[in-house]
């Protein structure tokens, strides 16, 4: 036949048709991604006989997307900007006005939230005052992530539903952010804790006879009172009981001090020209698959003997994510100075992991009391 029919998806889809000439004109745009936005024009195709039913036909499709994702072009473009200019570009791409921040530190604190957008299986905890934009950023910036707010969370919903034979949230998402985590009810604490520990360690999960793997990061987002904004106090006491175990907390790579971010105000809302948000979220998604940056980190980071493996891996993952965000043009160890690598990648990664280590000492002093992260340092490129 001269038509391309939708088959195997139920009777409704059998009554839809794409004429051959329309398919030839639109197929490239329709198939370039798993999801596409565009303007669709539909028409009615009359039946060939009284015994047949009419069909809805596609007349035309106009792609909304005004760009093509070219990762190499994006990397090359970074060389045309200073670091401060690039930081402002990133903030504009996520709908924030860089001029509304009081300091570079505040800007970098906001950009730190994007680490799990660019690095696979990066697990983070952020506690912050209300109104700092946690829900918006993790729920609206990228279509590749998932924000779950309050309610009930089960192993079936997170990993795999045996009854329905469907994959859970970690499958097919870049991250799963549990917003207002203090209000989430976990149906079976021991079951959920065991599943999380296994997945956060190696990216694999087993539910019944089903074995799965995914690349989604796990993000905990919670509100914290001003009196508890101290990394040397127990900041995790209000978290659900499932997270009151040191072995699980140890699998979170870093902690974000959300209180370093300003409360959302009108001055922080984007105005004027900015990088397209959908384009930027797609770029971040593509960066997850680029192994170049981890190779640079491995070459530039000196690891002391007998360093704790989880600490080292956590710091390197966070460091890699910072490198992708702030210096995407870096493709070789010598492409970034030791000063910039240490100040903007390694040092903040160590600080984020150190807070997890301090909290572990408070939560489980017998196992982690007095322990610190290894003293990783920057190697010169000629070493």
Each PLM stretch: what is its role?
Residues 54-101:
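Charged, amphipathic alpha-helical linker segments immediately N-terminal to NTP-binding catalytic cores
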Residues 211-218, 223-326, 330:
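Phosphate-sensing "switch" segment of ASCE/P-loop ATPases
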Residues 298-383:
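C-terminal alpha-helical "lid" subdomain
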